[in-house]
A protein has these predicted regions:
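N-terminal pro-sequences and low-complexity stem/linker regions of secreted or lumenal proteins
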Residues: 475-970
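An exposure/low-complexity boundary signal
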Residues: 37-40, 889
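Predominantly soluble domains enriched in secretory-pathway, periplasmic, or organellar proteins
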Residues: 42-505
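Bacterial N-terminal signal peptides
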Residues: 25-37
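N-terminal secretory signal peptides that target proteins for export/translocation
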Residues: 1-22
């Protein structure tokens, strides 16, 4: 094999500047394991006060509230990297291993398995430097390393005697939608997106790889194509060969000892038939649950490699992922079933299923869902498997003996979200790729005396863990229990057993007890950190210098969010509230599902297959336990959904035009409805209905959404001002009040604080602040105020910085039943605590391990009868920044700007138009670093450098928009 055809001299010259081929020692972060005897003696607290990040005892707290105490030695892979998969070099004397990454400038990192030193950050010779979610393997002789790159390449790299990579060839494996079958008359065609929607012409999304015994062929799974492809390694350069259809969304491939039979795990299960209920996933119709829309089949394809023919298809648990052979059996990790399917390879039949259930659960209802097994390493000599549990930050030690009644022997604590595990038999160690490592903590934005953490500063790691002796495994298991707060017995006990005859209180002691709160409103907003909005509130732990959307002290003296600042004067100020998510795609999942399921989370940060965000449209992104709204619906509660999990909008104006009205037209209609003077034709001042109210037609393929959604409320669309959204809601709310039919749960997606719409960032924040303020105003002045609670949260905090952690975000609870005019609440809470609080009030069962162990937000609710003043209504204040600022002729006043500032502003306004053109309807489709700089500069008058930087940078330095069609926000 020669890689010369894939590079040229200029590439080689530039490559030396970006390649780090020298030894790079650990930085000292988590370089050694912690003492379990000290930590395991601790007890989880129901209402902890710690902040995310490093703790005084050497542990770390990550953004979902888990404690991280990884065993063994930790390999620091550097800033902004996700560790996805790991491969051990079979040449023992090299003592090296390779890590496949995402989100970095290199695809692969090579490290020393003895010392943990990173030896090489490898950047490919071709134009594609991306990694992938899975797919890395050495040839049997250790001379080649094959790995997938999610920009439609499979790369074959030469390995030298020291284990370093020297040369490579990239094989382009094109996207091909001819392997997708469509059934136009099958459900849910009547209200979902057409078959083939969301298929990306940008990439085939290569994943799992394997090599033939003789090294003549490589085999790669093309996840979006739903195919297996052969690559001829004897050709110069290597070339793609036969491609065949397997199951939906193939994940991993292993080759049997006979060298001719391959097994492929298919996360999306079998191909759909016309009789199946289907939900789209990246263009493919997935066999789905007819209520919540999640995938309901998982399969393994058996392939004869010489003929490239599928011999049979084996049904497994849900979302089968990692696999490993054990004797005459194949072990398959079922990520969404918390099980391992044991397949007899002689008959290709599942002989038994190993249960990896977590040691917690609602009494009488079985174990809690959500271990997330995804990778398996086998010690055949000792009949033990080591299984990575993505959602437990642990490796399960599993007894493979056929008669084992309690197969899980214990658990080993590793770092955040383990995605791959390999057994190094020579060193008797486990090599574990930790997808999220220690969280997004080591931000480069702490330079120059300013700390500004952001969710995108991923710090994936590798754990090198000595195989534990039986005497140490018990202590490790106890540590895992503590780290995940599975010891919070009071939270588990309060998740059931309620008595409907108990005296009602606002926040019931048990789920099932009655509540005084009959109406829950959940408002979801977009992408802000705590410091951006509330960093200037003296009572909280904020950094005023980062409060660019605050009371005006950091934004030219004009208050941007006056209503939010009034809320936290009367209602609880939560200065330790976190969004576990990195961005919108996993953010809405955390809110609605209490977790971000593996198939969704593992795509981060490239999001090639899909980007569900708050929009529906991907069966693989949903857990089979459903959503917060579907739980309420299943319980028989009336529900209304405004915007969340809606797939698309169509438009039809009263004059018959299908063109979407402009931002200005929507805004003028809103002003007319509200009785303002800015009334354009055809409305008149004081109109009683919105002229464009029936222009919008929203759709969702999820029945649990479609049957409860408000059809004329828009999904994500920055071309629509939030005032128009609120006016639509006001009409609906007034009708429900008059009819006495206000539902038990209303969910509203009010999203213009996302920015990059037509107005300036300050105007969009002001629009959002006013919109939510008006909703609170309407509810508090209504007859149902005395039985209502309003929960407000961001889906994520990605478009800003925070001096504590990039995931810290503003959260609010507005109700007569919360503590008012009280002290700041420093309790550590996350979105999942808010979800659990809603479940506690409405009597909804927890969906998984995360909301099961989450504490209801009891520190914020009044004990006993609230004071009479708590029931007084709250009145919003008007915006102080024109909401149309930046639209049309309403430009920003730059008369006092210097020529240099005017030049900077002009360049950045042009850049904003460039990155947002045609993307108003797609969450996070712009490069976040560019957006964050734009928002910062616009809010600080182009006079303050972005946190961690020395100067105000011109827009010309930002030439990295997200690739077209990949659904990426990076």
């Amino acid at each position: 094999m020669s890689g010369k055809a894939s590079r040229n001299k200029p590439q080689k010259k530039s490559r030396k500047k970006s390649r780090l081929n020298c030894m790079r020692p650990l930085t000292g972060v988590l370089a050694a394991g912690l003492s379990f005897s000290t930590l395991a003696a601790a007890q989880s607290k129901e209402y902890p006060k710690y902040f995310t990040g490093p703790q005084s005892n050497g542990s770390w707290v990550v953004s979902d509230g888990a404690v991280i105490t990884p065993a063994g030695t930790q390999v620091d892979l550097g800033i902004r990297v996700r560790a996805k998969a790991i491969a051990l070099n079979p040449t023992a004397k090299s003592h090296t291993a390779a890590v496949l990454t995402l989100g970095a400038t290199q695809a692969v990192e090579i490290f020393d398995t003895n010392t943990g030193n990173v030896l090489q950050n490898y950047v490919t010779f071709g134009t594609d430097s991306s990694g992938s979610y899975s797919g890395i393997a050495y040839s049997a002789n250790g001379q080649y390393l094959v790995f997938s790159q999610d920009s439609s390449n499979v790369t074959i790299a030469k390995v030298n005697a020291q284990g370093l990579l020297e040369d490579d060839a990239q094989v382009f494996v094109a996207p091909n939608n001819s392997f997708i079958a469509c059934f136009p008359n099958s459900p849910p065609a009547s209200y979902g997106n057409p078959c083939g929607s969301f298929y990306s012409g940008y990439t085939s999304y290569p994943g799992g790889v394997a090599l033939s015994k003789d090294g003549s062929s490589a085999y790669a799974l093309l996840n979006q194509n739903n195919t297996l492809t052969q690559i001829d390694l004897t050709a110069t350069p290597p070339t793609q060969g036969t491609q065949i259809r397997v199951g939906n969304a193939p994940h991993s491939i292993v080759i049997a000892s006979n060298g001719t039979t391959a097994y492929i795990s298919n996360e999306g299960g079998r191909a759909a038939t016309q009789a199946d209920f289907q939900i789209n996933s990246a263009g493919t119709e997935i066999v789905a649950d007819p209520f919540v829309g999640a995938a309901i089949t998982g399969t393994v394809s058996v392939v004869d490699l010489p003929t490239m023919t599928v011999l049979s298809t084996i049904s497994t648990g849900l979302h089968p992922t990692g696999m490993a052979f054990y004797g005459g059996n194949l072990l398959v990790a079922n990520t969404y079933s918390d099980t391992i399917s044991v397949i007899d390879t002689a008959t290709n039949v599942v002989g038994r299923t190993i249960n990896l259930a977590l040691p917690i659960g609602v009494p009488g209802q079985g174990p809690a869902y959500g271990a997330g097994p995804n990778s398996i390493a086998v010690d055949s000599k000792n009949a033990v498997a080591y299984v990575a549990l993505y959602n437990a930050n642990a490796i399960a030690v599993v007894d493979l003996s056929p008669g084992a009644t309690n197969p899980v022997l214990g658990m080993i604590p590793v770092a955040y979200a383990p995605s791959s595990v390999v057994l190094d038999a020579t060193n008797n160690t486990l090599l574990v790729a930790n997808d999220k490592g220690i969280g997004a903590r080591l931000s480069y934005e702490c330079d120059h005396g300013v700390c500004g953490y952001n969710t995108h500063q991923d710090n994936g790691t590798v754990s090198i863990v000595p195989v534990p002796l039986p005497g140490t495994l018990q202590a490790m298991t106890q540590q895992v229990i503590y780290n995940n707060h599975w010891d919070l017995a009071q939270n588990i006990a309060s998740a059931s057993g309620g008595n409907p005859k108990t005296k009602p209180v606002a926040l019931p002691a048990k789920i099932g007890d009655p509540s005084l709160i009959k109406h829950v409103f959940l408002i979801v907003r977009e992408n802000r950190t705590y410091d951006q909005i509330l960093g200037d509130v003296a009572a909280g732990n904020g950094d005023p210098s980062l409060a660019v959307f605050g009371d005006g002290s950091a934004a030219g003296g004009t208050p941007v969010t006056p209503n939010a600042h009034l809320w936290v004067q009367r209602f609880p100020l939560l200065d330790n509230f976190y969004d576990p998510s990195r961005q919108s795609a996993d953010g809405h999942q955390w809110i609605q599902e209490g977790m971000a399921p593996y198939a969704d989370d593992i795509q981060s940060p490239d999001w090639v297959r899909s980007y569900p965000g708050g929009n529906a449209g991907d069966a693989l992104a949903y857990q089979n336990k459903g959503f917060l709204f579907s739980e309420a619906e299943a319980a028989g509660l009336p529900v209304k959904i405004y915007g969340e999990y809606i797939e698309n909008n169509t438009y039809k104006q009263p004059n018959g035009s299908k063109k979407e009205p402009s931002w200005s037209e929507f805004y003028a209609d809103s002003q007319c409805f509200e009785g303002g003077p800015d009334c354009g034709p055809p409305g008149t001042p004081g109109e009683t209905t919105l002229y464009y109210q029936n222009t919008i037609r929203s759709e969702s393929s999820i029945p649990a959404v479609y049957n409860y959604m408000v059809r004329n409320f828009p999904y994500f669309d920055l071309n629509i001002p939030d005032q128009f959204r609120v006016d639509l809601w006001v009409q609906d709310f007034n009708n429900d009040l008059a009819a006495g039919t206000v539902p038990a749960m209303e969910q509203l997606w009010i999203m213009d604080d996302h920015t990059t719409g037509p107005p300036t960032p300050q105007a969009e924040q002001a629009d959002n602040d006013l919109a939510v303020g008006r909703i609170i105003d309407y509810i508090s002045h209504s007859p149902i105020w005395s039985s209502s609670a309003i929960f407000i949260e961001e889906d994520d905090a990605q478009n800003g910085v925070d001096h504590i952690d990039g995931h810290r975000s503003p959260g609010y609870i507005i109700s007569p039943y919360v503590v008012q005019n009280g002290p700041t609440d420093h309790t550590y809470y996350t979105q999942v605590n808010m979800t659990r609080t809603i479940e506690q009030i409405l009597g909804l069962p927890p969906m998984n391990q995360f909301d099961l162990i989450a504490s209801p937000m009891g520190t914020d609710f009044v004990k006993g009868t609230p004071p009479a003043d708590n029931f007084l209504p709250w009145t919003h204040v008007p915006n102080q920044i024109p909401l149309s600022q930046g639209v049309g002729d309403n430009i920003v006043d730059d008369s006092k700007d210097s020529p240099a500032v005017k030049t900077l502003r002009k360049g950045w306004l042009q850049k904003k138009e460039e990155i947002s053109a045609g993307k108003m309807h797609k969450p996070d489709s712009e490069d976040p670093d560019t957006v964050n700089h734009f928002d910062w500069y616009m809010s600080t008058g182009f006079t303050r450098p972005y946190p961690g930087e020395k100067t105000v940078r011109p827009a010309s330095e930002f030439n990295n928009p997200a690739p077209a069609g990949d659904g990426d926000d990076d």
